[in-house]
Amino acid sequence: MTEEYWKGVDKIQYVGHQDKKSGLGFQYYNPEEEIMGKKMKDWLRFAVAYWHTFDQRLVDPFGDGTAQRPYDKYTDPMDLALAKVDAAFEFYQKLGVDYLCFHDRDLAPEGDTLRETNANLDKVVDKIVEYQKTSGMKVLWNTSNMFTNPRFVEGAATSPYADVFAYSAAQLKHSLEIGKRVGSENYVFWGGREGYESLWNTNMKQEQEHAAKIFHMAKDYANEIGFDAQMLLEPKPKEPTTHQYDFDAATTIAFMKEYDLDKDFKLNLEGNHANLAGHTYQHEIRVAREAGLLGSLDANQGDKLIGWDIDEYPSNLYETTAAMYEVVENGSIGPRGGLNFDAKPRRSSFAPEDLFLGHIVGMDSFAAGLRVAAAMKQDGFLDSLKADRYSSYKSGVGADIESGKADLKSLEAYAIDKPQSELIAATHSDHLEEIKDTINHYIIDTLSK
């Protein structure tokens, strides 16, 4: 019988508004409850990130790791890797999630050659596949870590060294094969070092062409082996490079269109990455969904007082409400999307149970956001605001502009003799403060029921 790793933790249940001191439990996430005709678990499709949850030691630039994990007794790298799989699947069962996400290098130690590394990885994947058969766990997405090893010091696909490009392509090939084995619904590309430190020594066009080339290779090989996954690019503006090529949603969409990738690729968007790019999470989701390219979401939050990626568990209800409003407007997160918790406990939250507590606050925060977003959508609150605001385009000159009937000459004839008083009289206050106050009331009222 497999050792119990997460002792003292039972399966997390929906407890509603019981006193939080009554124990671990969800206050707002009730997986089977229907919201706007769909179960909460189907709206949210929560996933656990293998790297932050089971590998992260809570290090920072000024101190060693503080994490206490129930598998720390294992010292042999392969024994540890296999023990983590046992611990992970117990964690998934107790938390009550259906999906996991992983990088290839999260799972197993590297060998001296790619052949040795692949052999290590295959042993761990064999065990994951066996657990999938008995647990029903699915993989939301998998990916390749092509940023940690020193070989990727100047990128993977965008490296100036052809040997590194070749190695990256070979690593990617095996990662796609693993994706097929575990039935991954999506495949993510996050280019942690696909950018530059300085433009003085960078051939930007060549590097971006190489990135596009490897993306096309990946899609072609996935088709060849019958790996039917949605391909996703994940924007981030910087860190670890000074400037990453997939800066934000708009930049990445432009890149996709430039290199004919937008038919096969969509976006995986992260809250903290949006903040680093100077945007709200809602902004990035809006840009992607209005382009028809929203694929999946990474759930975390940043700290606006801190200028780097901290991957904190989401707890800001205003932000989760805004994000979930975009999802409700879209009808889903994406064709195969979900909410992956790319998040870790704070360095001072080092106990094993903090991993459960972090996921609970994140899952509850997005479930709460879904409840509030659905209430606003069903009431038509924001829809009516926008309809009123743009009502001048429903008739007269506005209708001519919308239909394409108007041109510069006809619009000059319409506007040339209009006095300023008439133009100003046509404008109306947005009452933004009232809108924000109303949203606050929706949050308070919906979550107190």
From Swiss-Prot:
It comes from the Bacteria. Its EC number is 5.3.1.5. GO terms for molecular function: magnesium ion binding; xylose isomerase activity. GO terms for cellular component: cytoplasm. It catalyses: alpha-D-xylose = alpha-D-xylulofuranose. The active site is at 103, 106. Mg(2+) 1 binds at residues 234, 270, 298, 342. Binds 2 magnesium ions per subunit. SUPFAM superfamilies: Xylose isomerase-like (SSF51658). HAMAP family: Xylose_isom_A. Homotetramer. Belongs to the xylose isomerase family. This is Xylose isomerase. It comes from Levilactobacillus brevis (strain ATCC 367 / BCRC 12310 / CIP 105137 / JCM 1170 / LMG 11437 / NCIMB 947 / NCTC 947). The lineage of its organism: Bacteria, Bacillati, Bacillota, Bacilli, Lactobacillales. The gene is xylA.
